């Protein structure tokens, strides 16, 4: 399935049905009085988090969603049927953003969470509603209220416990395939990974989700390479695993390039807990390995772990370090806010527009 993490869609809730002007007509009843029913309410547009989805690809082929309008009122005091709501299914971690691409409307963080994004219009009153002691035969009815319409952006930010970062061809996909059942594309050239990949990692009796994002290059925050758009997928992670290729020219400079891009990104990535590992140690000599390790240690100001995604050497040490940090690291403030808003949305019933009167 092709991965798509952003889509623009148009939504419109249903118009309310019109009220009806009608009078009761029966044998031997000369003045039957008004009997026009009210119009039905238009259908809502609802967004719901569905389990098992991990892409927004469905919204590439359909961008317009319109809920049906409410049925018109009829004689004999028959009210029109309400329009059926339409439900947009989205993956866990989806954000609803206004058309300006800046205003966050909602952040979905729980499976099954629902949000009424556009409420259907209220139905109009039939003439039976307007009868009174002074107006026994009203000949007026209201039209239904129009529905709401808007353009919105759907933006997916994958939810994972740990995220893999590094330069292109640092061995991130090989590491992910080694520690999980994920099967990312692996090749000996930069930018093999074009879309984020997720894998479930099991360590003894613990398991966590590991995300692999496409590699960063210098100037990514300005759009170089694949840009930094995929950094949002590790923004929710509790810990970052920074892999550096032991066979690169200078491990310290390679580390600083990625750190610079993370600091330039408009988020809290640079403040997250980071585990640094020197990868592909099987491909260099012992002398070069020591030299690269010292360079990386000076740049990162911490002792890097040594690992090989091909032979498996050092993999368990890295996984144990990740599990230890995941168990201690708190959820980021942004994720906390998202959880709080989601909890409030689930506990508080969605407010409905009050019935209008002429």
Curated annotation (Swiss-Prot):
Compartment list: Cytoplasm
Occurrences of domain Obg (ranges): 1-159
InterPro entries linked to this entry: G_OBG, GTP-bd, GTP-bd_Obg/CgtA, GTP1-OBG_CS, GTP1_OBG_dom, GTP1_OBG_dom_sf, OBG_GTPase, P-loop_NTPase
Residues annotated for Mg(2+) binding in this entry: 173, 193
One of the GO BP terms on file: ribosome biogenesis
Cofactor: Mg(2+)
Its EC number(s): 3.6.5.-
Residues noted as binding GTP in the record, renumbered to the chain: 166-173, 191-195, 212-215, 279-282, 308-310
Region (Disordered): 335-358
Pfam family, one: MMR_HSR1
S-S bridge residues: none
Domain OBG-type G: 160-327
Keywords from the named record: Cytoplasm, GTP-binding, Hydrolase, Magnesium, Metal-binding, Nucleotide-binding
Keyword Metal-binding appears in the UniProt entry: yes
Gene Ontology molecular functions: GTP binding; GTPase activity; magnesium ion binding
Tree of life domain: Bacteria
First-level EC class: hydrolase
Cellular component terms per the entry's GO annotation: cytoplasm
Assembly: Monomer.
Similarity comment text for this entry: Belongs to the TRAFAC class OBG-HflX-like GTPase superfamily. OBG GTPase family.
Cited function: An essential GTPase which binds GTP, GDP and possibly (p)ppGpp with moderate affinity, with high nucleotide exchange rates and a fairly low GTP hydrolysis rate. Plays a role in control of the cell cycle, stress response, ribosome biogenesis and in those bacteria that undergo differentiation, in morphogenesis control.
Name of protein: GTPase Obg
Source organism of the structure: Nitrobacter winogradskyi (strain ATCC 25391 / DSM 10237 / CIP 104748 / NCIMB 11846 / Nb-255)
Organism lineage string: Bacteria, Pseudomonadati, Pseudomonadota, Alphaproteobacteria, Hyphomicrobiales
């Amino acid at each position: 399935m092709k991965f798509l993490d952003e889509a623009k869609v148009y939504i419109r809730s249903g118009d309310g049905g019109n009220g009806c002007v009608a009078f009761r007509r029966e044998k031997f009843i000369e003045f039957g009085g008004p009997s026009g029913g009210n119009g039905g309410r238009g259908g809502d547009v609802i967004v719901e988090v569905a389990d098992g989805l991990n892409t927004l690809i469905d919204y590439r082929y359909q961008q317009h969603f319109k809920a049906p309008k409410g049925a018109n009122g009829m004689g004999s005091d028959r009210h029109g049927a309400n329009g059926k709501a339409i439900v947009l299914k989205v993956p866990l971690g989806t954000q609803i953003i206004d058309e300006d691409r800046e205003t966050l409307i909602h952040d979905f963080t729980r499976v099954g969470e629902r949000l009424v994004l556009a409420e259907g219009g209220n139905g109009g009153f039939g003439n039976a509603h307007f009868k009174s002691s002074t107006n026994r035969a009203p000949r007026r009815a209201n039209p239904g209220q129009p529905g709401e319409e808007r353009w919105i952006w759907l933006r997916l930010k994958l939810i994972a416990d740990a995220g893999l970062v590094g330069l292109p061809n640092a061995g991130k996909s090989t590491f992910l395939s080694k520690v999980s059942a994920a099967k990312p594309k692996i090749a000996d050239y930069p930018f093999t990974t074009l879309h984020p990949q997720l894998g479930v990692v099991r360590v003894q009796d613990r398991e966590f989700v590991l995300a692999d994002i496409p590699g960063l290059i210098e100037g990514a925050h300005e759009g170089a390479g694949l840009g930094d758009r995929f950094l949002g997928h590790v923004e929710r992670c509790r810990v970052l695993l920074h892999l550096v290729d032991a066979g690169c020219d200078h491990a310290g400079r390679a580390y600083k390039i990625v750190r610079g891009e993370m600091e330039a990104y408009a988020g809290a990535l640079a403040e997250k807990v980071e585990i640094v590992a020197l990868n592909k140690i099987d491909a260099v000599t012992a002398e070069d390995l020591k030299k690269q390790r010292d360079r990386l240690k000076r740049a990162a100001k911490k002792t890097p772990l040594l690992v090989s995604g091909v032979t498996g050497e050092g993999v368990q040490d890295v996984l144990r370090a990740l599990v230890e940090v995941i168990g201690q690291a708190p959820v980021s403030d942004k994720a906390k806010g998202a959880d709080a808003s989601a909890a409030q949305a689930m506990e508080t019933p969605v407010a409905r527009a009050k019935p209008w009167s002429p």
